[in-house]
């Protein structure tokens, strides 16, 4: 079996690592336990977590054991990384519910049977810490001068950084130490924005335990313009089908820019690299084949083959003009009483768009269509005249479709 390090390197996941030669040798000759942390601030994972899941799956396929650490304890503080404001603190009940949702989603591509992967909650050890003991055992190993040079803190110093958040790096470092002691976890993985926190944990284990520990970060999923992928007009692209339907999920990947196809095929599918290279070499109209494969493969991973097939059929029916096969399109249901209300109100009420202001903005920009007719009047009222045999068809931009059915 080839070394998983080489697989991760070839597919373009790896951004930074602490000890390159040692890590490659370790992954080639031993089966290790490693961990990735998940911040339970929502009840669903989103596309921003997708790379972490893929790396975990590649590592597990090579015989290594993933530990999914949910931050039930740190989530009650909030990670300052990449944030300009202090996060809202969450209740234990919210965090526990979110953790359960995460495990169901992770289990779609990670095997949790027979301890092949485990999920742990850092609340188990953080919430009962003795503050004095923690300062004496852990705090003594952290230099404030060094911490202040970390990017996650530098960007917050001018606007204000609470002592609560300043402790986050110590907590994350302590997580790694606890996992090392309990599960012989020797490596922490994460997005490149976690580099400073990962280094802190590696250094803590080497100081406290006089043992080797390693860290690796991977690239963030960005498009050719450097912007994070996974954002839509309706907000984040969620992995929960109740928040982002399989059809919308499929359509997002079907419509990525030509320049992003190769990167997405490498990073978020398990297609062999020879097939990735073949699909990525297609040009002109043929690149659509690669986009269809990408959309199907990614949707299959998250929602299963049946839902991926339904989304594919719905998308092809739409572009082929066959509106009889659109049962899998995102559909909102309203009462007859809801007619004779403004389009803007209904779009917000049906959650087709996140707000009335977003609906108005789209109309002003000429990007909203009802039954394939451009909407030019912000005050347009939907009436029975707009209801066709298949409902009211809403199009946002060129390729985002929804249907409103009157019951």
Curated annotation (Swiss-Prot):
InterPro entries reported in the protein's UniProt record: aa-tRNA-synth_I_CS (IPR001412), aa-tRNA-synth_Ic (IPR002305), Rossmann-like_a/b/a_fold (IPR014729), S4_RNA-bd_sf (IPR036986), SYY-like_C (IPR054608), Tyr-tRNA-ligase (IPR002307), Tyr-tRNA-ligase_bac-type (IPR024088), Tyr-tRNA-ligase_bac_1 (IPR024107)
Protein name (database record): Tyrosine--tRNA ligase
Gene3D superfamilies: HUPs, RNA-binding S4 domain, Tyrosyl-Transfer RNA Synthetase
GO annotation terms (biological process): tyrosyl-tRNA aminoacylation
Residues the record lists as binding L-tyrosine: 35, 168, 172
Cysteine disulfide partners in this protein: none
Residues annotated for ATP binding in this entry: 231
Organism encoding this protein: Clostridium botulinum (strain Loch Maree / Type A3)
SUPFAM superfamilies, A to Z: Alpha-L RNA-binding motif, Nucleotidylyl transferase
Keyword Repeat: no
Localization per Swiss-Prot or TrEMBL: Cytoplasm
Motif ('KMSKS' region): 228-232
GO CC annotation: cytosol
Subunit field text: Homodimer.
Gene: tyrS
Motif ('HIGH' region): 40-49
Assigned protein family: Belongs to the class-I aminoacyl-tRNA synthetase family. TyrS type 1 subfamily.
EC number(s) from the headed UniProt entry: 6.1.1.1
Catalysed transformations (reactions): tRNA(Tyr) + L-tyrosine + ATP = L-tyrosyl-tRNA(Tyr) + AMP + diphosphate + H(+)
Domain S4 RNA-binding: 341-405
Keyword line: Aminoacyl-tRNA synthetase, ATP-binding, Cytoplasm, Ligase, Nucleotide-binding, Protein biosynthesis, RNA-binding
Gene Ontology molecular function: any one: ATP binding
């Amino acid at each position: 079996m080839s070394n998983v390090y080489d697989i991760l390197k070839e597919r373009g996941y790896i951004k930074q690592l602490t000890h390159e030669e040692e890590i490659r040798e370790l992954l080639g000759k031993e089966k290790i336990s490693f961990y990735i942390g998940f911040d339970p601030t929502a009840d669903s994972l989103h596309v921003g977590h997708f790379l972490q899941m893929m790396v975990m799956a590649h590592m597990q396929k090579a015989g290594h054991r993933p530990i999914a650490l949910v931050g039930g304890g740190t989530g009650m503080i909030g990670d300052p990384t990449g944030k300009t404001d202090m996060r809202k603190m969450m209740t234990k009940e919210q965090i526990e519910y979110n953790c359960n949702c995460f495990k169901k989603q992770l289990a779609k591509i990670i095997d949790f049977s027979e301890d092949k992967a485990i999920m742990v909650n850092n609340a188990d050890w953080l919430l009962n810490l003795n503050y004095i003991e923690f300062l004496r055992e852990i705090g003594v190993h952290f230099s404030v001068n060094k911490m202040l040079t970390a990017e996650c803190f530098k960007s917050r110093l001018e606007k204000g950084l609470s002592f609560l958040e300043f402790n986050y790096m110590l907590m994350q470092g302590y997580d790694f130490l606890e996992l090392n002691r309990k599960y012989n976890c020797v490596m922490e993985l994460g997005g490149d924005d976690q580099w400073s926190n990962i280094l802190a944990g590696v250094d803590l284990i080497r100081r406290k335990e006089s043992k080797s520990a390693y860290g690796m970060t991977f690239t963030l999923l960005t498009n050719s313009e450097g912007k994070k992928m996974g954002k839509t007009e309706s907000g984040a692209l969620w992995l929960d089908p109740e928040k982002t339907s399989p059809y919308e999920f499929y359509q997002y990947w079907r419509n990525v820019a030509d320049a992003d196809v190769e990167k997405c095929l490498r990073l978020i599918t398990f297609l062999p690299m020879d097939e990735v290279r073949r699909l990525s070499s297609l040009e002109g109209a043929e690149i659509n084949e690669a986009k269809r494969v990408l959309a199907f493969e990614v949707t299959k991973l998250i929602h299963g083959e049946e839902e991926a097939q339904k989304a594919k059929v719905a998308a092809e029916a739409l572009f082929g003009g066959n509106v009889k096969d659109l049962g899998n399109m995102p559909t909102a249901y309203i009462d007859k009483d809801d007619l004779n209300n403004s389009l803007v109100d209904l779009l917000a009420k049906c959650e087709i768009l996140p707000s009335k202001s977003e609906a108005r903005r789209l109309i002003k920009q000429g990007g909203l269509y009802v039954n394939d007719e451009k909407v030019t009047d912000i005050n347009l009222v939907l009436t029975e005249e707009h209801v066709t045999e298949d409902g009211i068809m809403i199009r946002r931009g060129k390729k985002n479709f929804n249907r409103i059915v009157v019951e």
